Amino acid sequence: MIKKYWFLMVYSVTAFSVWAQDTPLDTLVVTANRFQEPLSTVLAPVTIVTREDIDRWQVSSVNDVLRRLPGVAISQHGGEGQLSTIFVRGTNSNHTLVLIDGVRLNLAGVSGAADLSQFPVALVQRIEYIRGPRSAIYGSDAIGGVINIITSRENTGTEISAGWGSNSYQHYDISTHQQLGENTRVTLLGDYTYTRGFDAVAYGSTGMQPQSDRDGFLSKTFYGKLEHNLSDTWSGFVRGYGYNNRTKYDAWYSPGSPLIDTRKLYSQSWDAGLRYAGETLQSQLVSSYSHSKDYNYDPHYGRYDTSANLDDMKQYNLQWTNSVTVGHGNVGAGIDWQKQSTTPGTGYLPKGYDQRNTGIYLTGLQKLGDFTLEGAVRNDDNSQFERHTTWQSSAGWEFIEGYRFIASYGTAFKAPNLGQLYGMYGNPNLAPEKSKQWEGAFEGLTGGVNWRISGYRNDISEMINYNPHTLRYYNDGKVHVKGIEATVNFDTGALTHTVSYDYTDARNALTDKPLERRPKLQVKYQLDWQVFDFDWGITYQYMGSRYDSDYSSWPYKSVKMGGVSLWDVAVAYPVTPHLIVRGKIANLFNKDYETGYGYQAAGREYILSGSYTF
């Protein structure tokens, strides 16, 4: 279950909370400021999801995890594996930075937005999710927030799991994490997931050529990691993973031409690192390489036919991060270097291009009596748009024991991607999108109820848009986002209740029209309890109405999609100390709804699974 953390403030006995899984008091978070710190010292709103949460919810995709979290809205073109977009606090899908073990996810293609429908949930051991601007720490993209997917495992042992469900869903997984001697650990994982799917296009709503078919998804994953303690303070690791996905989807069709309706994605990532953990100094050096090849093609002609489209991206990263204990807090500093390379013919890029970025950052955290102060500044030197500086600051005031007020301000930016710069409609003179965000929050513990409420405003300028008349991208867009976010957690006997409320008003500042696919109102509720060894969970989500475009006519029309209430029920039972049987019904009342106009979501689905550990 998701449950509020109750942690001791550093150098204080007062506990503050965030929305997260129940865990020991000394749990640390690394994503907020790129160094380990008690979760309660972080002034930004933080959510942590553990592997236990993922198993309890019985989710089959990363998107199914994220949709349950505060501030997140997801739009998807059909079922599992179909194109999806993530909106955090009303910002664009490419305004959320996605990290894998602290390293930027290599984005297949040149869209600049992470499509997590393709990332295997089997690799996820933990998610740290930070809301608000974080460009002063991570650089480009971190306007709405940061999602850090962590793959490292802690508990030794071997697990075999299997699951079957609606739409011919099958899932098989085997993983092991073993101690080799006193100082060496090895992790291996293999995963196979398949679903026949359902027809992604909603009948009669898009004007598309009828394609009465099933749009299925197949994924094969492998993961390996080797860790070794060189001494009491020095350690190193090497890690590699890859996945091979195939997705069928519905696409526009012109008689006599190939029907491009199949996607084949190959992705591999390798990284190695060296860590030092002293009493006052922590330091880490990590290098990584990733390569993604994303084919879209007509299966009758094959992915090497001239009609096929290939997005081929290589990414190189080098990170050096440091943190020093100073006074009642710490100071952090580091350097990030990244190079992205495309091959000729990638997407709509006629040539191969490189883009390099070097970022230098400085962070600080101090506890001064009843006040906690946090700040960061970063300068990025990019091969395309040269230098860009961002900064942020936050202050927390414990005005009454157990109650705190937090105020923060931060700037952020989004660099133009390679497609916008050099593609068929590219403009090499594009400038980065810029953001200024304010937030104020109260949090506390009242009568056993752990709560937090915040209000925020985000002004984004220099938005990159496409001009259909000049056939070029350009900077002129402005967006204003205003929102209220509230989270509450409390227990009533054996029941644990977790509630979040999001009001998000995201509008085009020039036309005052709401931004597409973002619901203005969301309410999420998680109820967990255990009775007679049965572990029950009920998930409720209300998504308010949202707007989208109808592309079946010209000029395009704006359409309003109604709101929907969704219920999931999950139960698990330990047959033996090693064998657990699980069952789940998703979309219990079989609601018919869309999160992207013209693309239907899954109806009622059943999943039966089991796992054996030894």
UniProtKB/Swiss-Prot annotation:
Its main location: membrane. GO terms for biological process: monoatomic ion transport. Ca(2+) 1 binds at residues 199, 211, 213, 215, 250. Cyanocob(III)alamin binds at residues 83, 85, 92, 110-111, 251, 517, 551. One of its GO terms (molecular function) is porin activity. Ca(2+) 2 binds at residues 213, 215, 249-250, 261. The chain crosses the membrane at residues 158-165, 169-178, 184-195, 217-227, 232-248, 263-277, 279-296, 309-325, 328-337, 353-369, 371-381, 385-400, 403-417, 434-443, 449-458, 473-490, 494-509, 517-529, 535-550, 558-572, 585-596, 602-614. Keywords: Calcium, Cell outer membrane, Ion transport, Membrane, Metal-binding, Porin, Signal, TonB box, Transmembrane, Transmembrane beta strand, Transport. Residues 155-614 form the TBDR beta-barrel domain. It is found in: Cell outer membrane. Belongs to the TonB-dependent receptor family. BtuB (TC 1.B.14.3.1) subfamily. This is Vitamin B12 transporter BtuB. The lineage of its organism: Bacteria, Pseudomonadati, Pseudomonadota, Gammaproteobacteria, Enterobacterales.
